[in-house]
Swiss-Prot record:
One of its GO terms (biological process) is protein refolding. Residues 528-538 have a biased composition (Polar residues). The gene is groEL1. The keyword Nucleus does not apply. Its main location: cytoplasm. Forms a cylinder of 14 subunits composed of two heptameric rings stacked back-to-back. Interacts with the co-chaperonin GroES. PANTHER family: 60 KDA HEAT SHOCK PROTEIN, MITOCHONDRIAL. InterPro entries: Chaperonin_Cpn60_CS, Cpn60/GroEL, Cpn60/GroEL/TCP-1, GroEL-like_apical_dom_sf, GROEL-like_equatorial_sf, TCP-1-like_intermed_sf. It comes from the Bacteria. One of its GO terms (molecular function) is isomerase activity. Belongs to the chaperonin (HSP60) family. This is Chaperonin GroEL 1. It is found in: Cytoplasm. It is an enzyme of class 5 (isomerase).
Length: 544
């Protein structure tokens, strides 16, 4: 396909125009009085949302060159979302402001490479300053405040996430599910839960709730498929003599062996439940090992020289209680604290070493399950459209609270960045010169953009609000919800330091890339061909 090549000022202006469109669509959602954006969907109802990165992902322009600008600024939002899970709108607004300021300087003859160096140095200085001003999150009240702000000033959501974090601990997993009712509910699971249920409904002990509950059972853990009854008979005899229930976790159980278990269960010879092993491949082996450590048992595997027919009771795990439903198995074990602690430490090291986001997520899940912390928030809403919006807000709120726990909190509502304007300006004057100084100053001017936009979305004059905030102490900012200047920590208007830092770093990275762009190579649009059908052939005016 033929390519179109555009150079220098024309190239930068085309990128800028694409960025203007995306930044405006995203910026309208910023702050407590930000508006919503409606996204048309090819299938199903339109989506009404308030989430910067979701809006950014939807925007595709007809002009290929402008669309390149959209893709660049979208990266600032996406990368911030990946790193901190929130702050995507702030990152977009900051990147846009830096590009606008920078292009003026490039047009006036500044050296783009020196500008970028100045931007990078200023951002490094600002990141250190943000860390200096961050306060650690010490109680669930602070967690509730962060979550409420991130969920669009929804205090009920803030309280719920704080409660969930309180119960599952800071390493616990808080997951979201679509609820069946109008209200949003929190469900906390005690013990380790994995998403495999009983193989046969004949194992059920409570027919009303359709679940099997085993008190103080033995747990047989194996990574092989059980096909022969002969393999199981010695195991069943030992457990029957001990007079305790049995949970079997295996790759699969073939019909003949399964029938034997069901018959024993129905005759009352043995209380038994069989479930399939969770996960796949290497992850399955690791999860079975986790279950074995939690329950004080061994994984019976031929790789380790252990055979099922030779298995003895002392290689089985034990638990206080096991509950098995159609879809899930929950094991509540006690004791083995030292072994579990060592295993958790090992998983933590793996989390630090891995580069894959997916692997990190799965390892984090395993860590949470081992330390007994999984909370599920069931999102309720009147309509599907509202449900999707609430789910996105809750996702942001959960990510924001985790970020706050990691790096602490700073005054929210664009306040921190606004107060750092005079600080970075003074530092730049003392340490930089020439175009590097110009680069640092353009960062300083861009820092006021989020606060200015929050005020404008609340119907105020953004520049006046910004100047008034800059004259006040560091913790004082603008409360757009109540149109007042308040101590942001006391008012509970706080942002995670990690979110503010990530938004600034990613915005500066994209701005630096755009300013140092000298040429754009894009596909030439294909010429539109006129179809003969449309010219007087008696066809109707409608497109089909």
């Amino acid at each position: 396909m033929a390519k179109s090549i555009i150079f220098s000022e024309e190239a930068r202006r085309a990128l800028e125009h694409g960025m203007d469109i995306l930044a405006e669509a995203v910026a309208v959602t910023l702050g407590p009085k930000g508006r919503n954006v409606v996204l048309e969907k090819k299938f199903g109802a339109p989506q009404i949302i308030n989430d910067g990165v979701t809006i950014a992902k939807e925007i595709e322009l007809e002009d290929h060159i402008e669309n390149t600008g959209v893709s660049l600024i979208r990266q600032a939002a996406s990368k911030t979302n990946d790193t901190a899970g929130d702050g995507t709108t702030t990152a977009t607004v900051l990147a846009h402001a830096m590009v606008k300021e920078g292009l003026k300087n490039v047009a006036a003859g500044a050296n783009p490479i020196a500008l970028k160096r100045g931007i990078d140095k200023a951002v490094k200085f600002l990141v250190d300053k943000i860390a200096e001003h961050a306060r650690p999150v010490e109680d669930s009240k602070a967690i509730a405040q962060v979550a409420a702000i991130s969920a669009g000033n929804d205090e009920e959501v803030g309280r719920m996430i704080a409660e969930a974090m309180d119960k599952v601990g800071r390493e616990g997993v808080i997951s979201l599910e679509e609820g069946k009712s109008m209200t949003t509910e929190l469900e906390v699971t005690e013990g380790m839960r994995f998403d495999k249920g009983y193989i046969s409904p004949y194992f059920v002990t409570d027919t009303e709730r359709m679940e099997a509950v085993l008190e103080n059972p033995y747990i047989l853990i194996t990574d092989k498929k059980i096909t022969l009854v002969q393999d199981l008979v010695p195991v069943l005899e030992q457990v029957a003599r001990a007079g305790r229930p049995l949970l079997i976790i295996a790759e699969d159980i073939e019909k003949e062996a399964l029938a034997t278990l069901v018959v024993n269960k129905l005759r009352g010879v043995l209380s038994v439940v069989a479930v399939k092993a969770p996960g796949f491949g290497d992850r399955r082996k690791a999860m079975l090992e986790d279950i074995a450590i939690l329950t004080g048992g061994e994984v019976i595997s031929e790789e380790r020289g252990l055979k099922l027919e030779n298995a003895r009771l002392d290689s089985f795990g034990t638990a206080r209680r096991v509950t098995v439903t159609k879809d899930n198995t929950t094991i509540v074990a006690e004791g083995n604290e030292a072994a579990v602690k060592a295993r958790c430490e090992q998983i933590r090291r793996q989390i630090e070493e891995t580069d894959s986001t997916y692997d990190k997520e799965k390892l984090q899940e395993r860590l949470a399950k081992l330390s007994g912390g999984v909370a599920v928030i069931k999102v309720g809403a009147a309509t599907e459209t509202e449900m999707k919006d609430r789910k996105l807000r809750l996702e942001d709120a959960i990510n924001a609270t985790k970020a706050a726990v990691e790096e602490g909190i700073v005054p929210g509502g664009g306040t921190t960045l606004a107060h750092l304007i005079p600080v970075v300006t003074e530092w730049a004057q003392a340490n930089l010169s020439g175009d590097e100084l110009v680069g640092a100053n353009l960062v300083a001017r861009a820092l006021g953009a989020p606060l200015r936009r929050i005020a404008e979305n609340a119907g105020q004059n953004g520049s006046i609000v910004l100047e008034r905030v800059k004259d006040k102490p560091f913790n004082t900012g603008y409360d757009a919800q109540n149109d007042a200047f308040v101590d942001m920590f006391e008012a509970g208007i706080v942002d995670p330091a990690k979110v503010t830092r990530s938004a600034l770093q990613n915005a500066a990275s994209i701005a630096g890339m755009v300013l140092t762009t000298e040429a754009i190579v894009v596909d030439k649009p294909e010429p539109k061909t006129n179809t003969p059908a449309s010219s007087g052939s008696g066809m109707s005016d409608y497109d089909y």
